[in-house]
Amino acid sequence: MSKNSTILFFFLLVSVSLFAQAALNKAITKFTSDIDLQNASISISVMDVQTGLMIASFNPDRVLTPASSVKLITTGAALGILNPNYVFKTELQYDGLFNAQTGILDGNIYLKGYGDPTLGSPEMVGVADMNGVMSQFATAINQAGFTKINGKIVGDGTFFQSIDGIGMNWQWDDLGNYYGAGAYGLNVNENYYFLNLQQMPLLGMQPKIAGTEPFLPEVTFTNRLTSASIGTGDNSSIYTPPLNDESIVRGTIPVGSGIFRVKGSMPDPVFTAAYFLQQKLKTDFKTTFKKAAANFDDLNEPILPRKTIYTQYSPKLSAIVERTNLESVNLYAETMLRTIGQVQSSTGTPNAGVEAVKNFWLARGVDLKGFFMEDGSGLSARNAISSKHFVSILRAIGNDGAIYPSFYESLPKAGETGTLKNMFKGTKAVGKLRAKSGSMTRVRSYTGFATRPNGKQWCFSVIVNNYTCTGSEIRSKLQDLMVSMCE
């Protein structure tokens, strides 16, 4: 190539880049000038992954509530600190004296968790559901020769030191609902259940509580529900403090004649796991027990040495991260946060996890001035993070060969998967944009990567708080803005 040709090529490249930058700035101006956003707080950043050049921005340093986009900060750090091949384990242990000749144990059987959020999951691919995993555990105990246990089946979730499992500063309204499930050292069935409600035929009548799936031992429900018009959907809420056996259900469900199911969070999954293992041993192998199941925190017995009978392993962390970001699973993100804290400082708490995550990104050159992280999932409304924080973290990921492949594959594809499946149809973003969404009342955010027509990759983050339009309207406006990043 001649010198003149090289100069011409460079000139054309710069011209195309400037044109794209001008078009994006125009789209940002249109978005930020929208009448529905005149009272809103907005932060937008678009950065070149390779060079670190800020392509376009609007209030890039303004910290806002980003909702579930926080999961990207947690999962990226988890892949870096724990590594993509990390697996969680769950152990069957026993203490006391075991007579192999008689099959009698004068001691307890322990279901010792190490934070696996997928244990007994009904939704994680490649994982046995709760009934299946309890069968595996019961079979292992039986094959080890235990037939009579003069003690208890004990659930042990002490791998994490945050006993009640919930995130820092979560709202009361969220705690009993499935997305507010706490993260424990021992989890089961993704720590949620279905509450079955018998619908009533007339407006104002009280639906009847028809049980739970799975059965929740010792949990009672105070029913404050009423029946609303057909088509009103699920407007019920379950209020359950962690480790409490009393729940309040209020709100409305539609009139009808069938069973209406709503999802709630288990108040004590550690005890629930122990209970179901004990029931499985009784029904499948006629194992006898002297005492009922228990949570280790309620045991009040001397701590004795234990021996391990059997170990169950989770899928690789890369697969768990993929489901976390594709389906926005709060429990998985919160478990990762506590595990990071445990691995880095032997303290499995949200605070320790947050400090470890911050230190991880600081070590990679990310400026965290004004960065306030309260949990791992984004459920806390007190998270305050700017779009510049997000793109700086994404750029660090994009230039880290150990993290990037698994992380990028975990992001929803525009128009195809996860929370972006029903967006971007027929636009240039399909096949070129991947992003994690975040939403709560009056909050919307999208953070991810966009591939340019010339193959360059941009990372972006858009956060909007306190818009005045509907959820579908703000989603449409944000979609138009993100499409412009791919044109």
Short names for language-model regions:
Residues 1-24:
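Bacterial Sec-dependent N-terminal signal peptides
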